[in-house]
Structure formats: structure tokens, C-alpha cells
């Protein structure tokens, strides 16, 4: 179990690093969005390429941050129901959710997303808009983001099983450490 906990710490570190860089994608998306709006209104000029970069960055930030968001315990849960149960029961509900819902959903996205990306990459698929961009970078974000989410699900599963065995403290307790946004 110690080897699995070490793997869990490695996955947590990876998603924390990704979370730190995704913050910059959000800033870039916001900057490009602002420049697009000003240039379009002030000079009556628009670029499909810049509009597409804007939504590429927006999509990348949400997809790549999914694992980090799970690490921080910020994914939506039905706490109204689970808060009535004991901590062990809540942990078992999490274990059930990771195995029955999160893993199959991530695997389905990977199963269909990887060939989707591969076809776009091999064919050099382009946007149908004049001045549009190649599509494969944004298609790559789907399998990449869901891989990070699934890995974080594995990490959370390991931590919860270790808690149930009495090897670690409650992994769902909020820690006083800084998040990537605060650093």
C-alpha cells in the first residue's frame, strides 16, 4: 500500500503542476478575448483565428484543470445526502463513485477521443472558417484532460482505501496549504 500511496502523491504533484500552468491559459484566454472585443469594436476588424484561439484556450483550461479540481475536492457532490452518513460511509460512497462512474466515463472519452484526435492529426483537419486553425490541438485536450482526471480519480481512490485501512488521515479534510491559485 505504501507504493500505491507514493504513486498517489506523484499523481497529486502532476495535477498540481498542471493546475499552476492552466491559470496562465485562463489569463491568456481573457487577454485574447479583450483584445478581440476592442479591435472588433474600435477598428471593425475580426479574425476567426483569434476567436478560435480564444475558445481553444478556454476548452484547454477546463479540460486540463479537471484533475486538479478533483484533487482540491471542488467537483460537484450531493453533500446534502452524504453529510448525514458517517465519515466511513461517505468514503465508501466516494470509492463507489470513482469505480462505477468516474472510471467508465473517463475510459469512454479516451476510447472515442483518442481516435478522434488521431484522425484530425493525420488528416491535418482544419476549421471550416476562413482563417481558421488546425483542429487537432483542441481535440488533443479531450483525451489529455480526461487522462489527468482519471489519474486523479485513481489517486483519490488509493487515498480513500488507505484511510479505510487506517493508514492515513481523512483525505477529504480540507488542508491549510495554499492552492495553485494562491501561490
Residue locations for each model-derived region?
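Alpha-helical transmembrane segments and membrane-interface helix-loop junctions
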Residues: 1-183
Amino acid at each position: 500500500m505504501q507504493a500505491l500511496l507514493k504513486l498517489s502523491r506523484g499523481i497529486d504533484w502532476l495535477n498540481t503542476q498542471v493546475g499552476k500552468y492552466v491559470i496562465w491559459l485562463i489569463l491568456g484566454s481573457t487577454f485574447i478575448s479583450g483584445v478581440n472585443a476592442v479591435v472588433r469594436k474600435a477598428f471593425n476588424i475580426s479574425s476567426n483565428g483569434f476567436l478560435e484561439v480564444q475558445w481553444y484556450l478556454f476548452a484547454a483550461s477546463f479540460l486540463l484543470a479537471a484533475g486538479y479540481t478533483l484533487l482540491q475536492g471542488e467537483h460537484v457532490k450531493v453533500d446534502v445526502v452524504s453529510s448525514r452518513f458517517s465519515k466511513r460511509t461517505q468514503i465508501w460512497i466516494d470509492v463507489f463513485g470513482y469505480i462505477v462512474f468516474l472510471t467508465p466515463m473517463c475510459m469512454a472519452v479516451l476510447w472515442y477521443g483518442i481516435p478522434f484526435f488521431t484522425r484530425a492529426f493525420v488528416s491535418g483537419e482544419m476549421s471550416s472558417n476562413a482563417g481558421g486553425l488546425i483542429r487537432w490541438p483542441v481535440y488533443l485536450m479531450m483525451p489529455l484532460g480526461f487522462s489527468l482526471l482519471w489519474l486523479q480519480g485513481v489517486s483519490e481512490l488509493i487515498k480513500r482505501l488507505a484511510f479505510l485501512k487506517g493508514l492515513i488521515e481523512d483525505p477529504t479534510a480540507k488542508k491549510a496549504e495554499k492552492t495553485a491559485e494562491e501561490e
